[in-house]
Amino acid sequence: MQGAYCVAVALLIAASGQAAANFGLEEPHQAPDSDFMASADTIDEMLQSRVLQVSHYPKDDLMLLAGNEERMLLARSNYLTKIPIPESIMTAANTMRMEGEASAIEAASKNVNQLRSNKRQPVASILNNVARHMSTTPDSDKFLVAVENDRPLVLAKRQRSAAITENGAKFAKQDDYRPVLSGPFTTNDEASNGRHNNQLFTLKALQLDKNENAGNVEDLWQEKKVSNRDLFHLLDEYENSAYLTVVSRLEANAIEAISKNSIRLESNKGKPIAPTPNIKVDQELYAPPDTGKSPVLVSTNIPYILAKRLKNEPPSAIIYNVAGFLAQHDYRPAPSGSSAISADAPNGQLDNQLITQKAFWLDKNKHIDDVESLFKEDTVEHLSHLREGNGESAHFTAVDRQSEPIVWPKDSAVFPQPQKKVVLNEEVNKVHEAFLKAFNLPFHQYLRETVTMLGIARWKRNSSPNSRAAISTLKIFAKNVDPKKLPKLLGTDFAKLQGDKKKHVA
């Protein structure tokens, strides 16, 4: 599937680039239903132009040229004329300007004088004036006055007052901020207009009452003691115990994993990658699949492995689709052992298979779902890796753990087996043959993948959501890529693919 998407990207980028390069033609265009050839100059000559007057007065020199559904002013030598301005207007304008400047200067001077007067005033005098207006000094010749009797209960707002609230109430009862009242000595502090409501000591008592447990001095001391001294000791003990537990668990897991790996290595030491009996030296590396047997599910955790490597957890829809294609392994007959193994096992049977190599190629792009990040990485340059190493060999050999293009028999030419019927025609065969000759792919391209590639290019908006995302990505690439840069990047590959340089990819 990665090959299908790569080639779809390359084909559509080349088509858009060549269309953009051949867009600015200077030749006249042919009408769709007529043999008449016309250019822009011919059309201008056919449309009659006439001169219109702007006004009905014959002395007016302004004229308009009407034609081609446009109107523009004609250039005249006497279009701009100098109008004499009376002296009275000039004198009045100068007088208004001078008066405005004088008023602005006067306002600025007033502001400067005010700032200078405020600058000399000391701060202490201002504070003394404010304090003098707010309160009066106590009379030392008179005794202290008890202004409230039930203040502890009022401040605490509960049935029983705390010790610290009692102390605050004692301080609040002794009022020496003002002279003795002529009326009764006790007032109700709960009244909305009580004289004692806004006093400074009442506010202090209310601030002290905010702590609900302020009266319990022993509990408060114990809390401070734990938070300052014992808390760090407890944390150190917890971290040490947790560290020892984690280390012991890691050691136990490591010993268990090493023992399991050694047993698995001994059991798999003499086993081939795929049990293909009667393989000769000159025979293919992979035997053709048995059509009588159903595909084998070789791994059940491919979606989660791909999601972890692509840093996209949980797996998205496109990862499930890729995993569904990779998990159905019908390149060889079914193995005799268990059909479900782990794909990330260090010695698993899936490690050196072709589908694992395809998954690793998909893993190269870390932001496969992020179109903007994909574009910032200059993906057109990244596509040039398809053309690297154009040597004599079109593909890597099996020694490098890659597959070679296999010449299958005619009765099994479409591999892997598709899930639905594949329509084969001459066009598909030509595109597939030209594709294999033009590109140096890191994996073998099957005919089914070529059919999928053409389907993506033809479906466009009438396809699945994943194909729509691929088409939108291709449009972004086609808009932002310079058409002059495409021939340099893709060079002779598309010339081979097209067969003729004059033809365009539809």
From Swiss-Prot:
Classify the main location. secreted
| Top-level taxon of origin | Eukaryota
**Chain ranges for the short sequence motif RxLR-dEER as given in the UniProt record:** 50-71
Keywords noted in UniProt: Host nucleus, Secreted, Signal, Virulence
| Annotated localization | Secreted; Host nucleus
Q: Which GO terms describe its cellular component?
A: extracellular region; host cell nucleus
UniProt signal peptide = 1-19
Tell me its family: Belongs to the RxLR effector family.
Its biological function? Secreted effector that completely suppresses the host cell death induced by cell death-inducing proteins.
**What does its UniProt record remark on the domains?**
The RxLR-dEER motif acts to carry the protein into the host cell cytoplasm through binding to cell surface phosphatidylinositol-3-phosphate.
Protein name as annotated: Secreted RxLR effector protein 134
